[in-house]
Every structure is written in structure tokens, then in C-alpha cells.
Amino acid sequence: DLFVPPSAALAGKIYKTLMSQVTAGKKFGGINEVEGVRFDLKKSEIANLESLGLIPMVNEYGKVMAFSGKTLFNGDNLGLQTYSVVRVFDYVTKVLMDFLNRRAFENFTATTRKDIMNQIVQFLDSITGPKNLIENFEIRRFEQDPKQKDRIYLDIHMKPYFPAKNFLIKMDGHKGTDANEWDTEYEQK
């Protein structure tokens, strides 16, 4: 038997998947032409490997798939812990920096401001909505510094898409016409 690390196949899968979509799980994380994994993992072992910053490969539902969308960031910011969010913000930042660098050294007049604003809104509109990169956005500030005139402030609030990871199921009911009720809650991690 030949055992090959899945990193190259996963990298190709990440490259071809929409940037805002995590390449993990049955639908988006399945690796083609792979027959199995070196060893099977339990749910608790998958969670432990993910908490260590590793991407566990799992053989479930007749398919080998990646089972994590985390980055190596271990702080409190959930966005920085999710690689699809980091990729989207990095892409948007690079596009805007390139665009604004091309517009550098133009006199910042009302006409220039309006033109730049329209082009930024047009770009952000093109990446907003389902099957795109962000859910919505708001330009909160686009103005010239009143004291240092060569400094322009641009504050954009974007709402990225986050992958569903934990499903919490709650059920309740009663037996026949009796008042005997029962409650149960399930949590999968």
C-alpha cells in the first residue's frame, strides 16, 4: 500500500472552491480518487486534532474528506480562526489597496471622492450576496483628515459568511393525553 499525504489534494480543492466557502465536510471537503485514510477517527479525536490546529482527514459517507476550517490563530476572534473569512478579508484588502494606490496623488475633490466611492461600492456590490464572498457591507467613513490633508480615511464594515459547524437539536413532547412531558437536548461537537 502507498500512503500519500493529502495536503496537495486539499490545496487543489481549496484553490478551486469559492473563497468564502470552507473546504471541509461532505459536500465541499471530499477528496476525489482517494480510497481511505491511514486510521479511522472518532468524533472526539477529530475535535482534539482540530483544536491542535490540524486538519483531520475522515473516511465517512463513503468518501475521504477534510474536517476542519480553522486557521492557526488561537485568540478570541472567530473570524481570524476561520480560514475562509481570512481569505476573503485578505482578498478585499489587496484589491482595495491596489485600486487606491492607482488613485494616489489625485486632488481629493468632491468629484474625485464621489468617483472613488462609486467604484468601491460597485466592487463590493459585485462580491455581495449568496454564492459570493460577503453577506453585506457598509461604508461607514470616507473622508479627508481635517488636519493632515494627504490622509484619507476609509472605514468599511463587511459581514462575511461563516460555515455551520455545530448543530444543536432540542426536542420535547408528551405521551398520549397524559401530562407526562419529556425534554431532551443533543449537542454535537
Residue ranges and their predicted role:
Residues 1-189:
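Structured, hydrophobic secondary-structure cores that serve as assembly/anchoring elements
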